[in-house]
Amino acid sequence: MKTIEISAPGKIIIAGEFAVLAEAPAISMAINKRAKATIIEHNKNIHVLKIIGFKDKELLFTVNDNGTIEWLDVVLNDPIKLFFECLWRQINIIPTAFYKFVLDTSGFYDEISGLKYGIGSSAALTVAMAGVFIETFKLPIGVKELALKTHREFQGASGSGVDIATSLEGGIIKYFRMERIKTTALELPEDLKFKIFWSGIPVSTPKQLSKVKTFSKTSFSNLNKMAVKFASIWGCNTNKLFIDYLDEYTDALMEFSMEYDLNIFGNKHNILL
């Protein structure tokens, strides 16, 4: 009985959030919180989907002759089912054996409160799932292509793809939404020291994106310019220049947040500024 496990990291965007939806770059950093996807061949005559992290549970299903999942319970519109089905539809396989599929995002939740951090768990899990499905079933598709198709179907194609790219590449990257511009690897300025803080309050990314219905406002234009400016100084390798430009970018982000009523700095983030 074979077992294959693949993991992928979450991410934190240093600069370029929202601006990357247009033509500006995003600077994104992978972090050591990983989603794990495992496929285990077993001798039960049923497929099992085990979820760890988001509402721990096990779901049973079969696959019909058309390659469609048929769940054995009657709960409708379960987000986990919908997410899993999004990937399954992309590959449309009919397994010749039975498997246990384990999706583990427990590292993306606060151990005390149980709240989600908001550091790209769905993208990390999508990349891990794409990798483990391709490896297990020898699929003729790349991890990037399968992960992007799955994630965009699940999110309604509203995201930029930066979280998928970060989970795939690791490290720190400069990412453009336009596919013609290649993602490039970056290094932090030498001797730069930093800490990552979590406000303790989760925010819905789809809800935030729904408020940005037009890119015509002045604050969005300013945010784009500052995202481009900030990305341009990478490689200069001076901490002062890095921090000065990051301060300017943060000011532009605050202006954008107020004009679009996003409350980006409302959950105690402003205390750190």
Model-inferred region functions:
Residues 1-15, 19-20, 28-31, 36-95, ...:
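C-terminal nucleotide
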Residues 22, 59, 124-126:
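Residues at secondary-structure transition points
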Residues 114-117, 163:
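Domain-wide signal for the mature, well-folded portions of proteins, strongly enriched
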Residues 117-142:
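DPxDG-like acidic metal-binding loop motif
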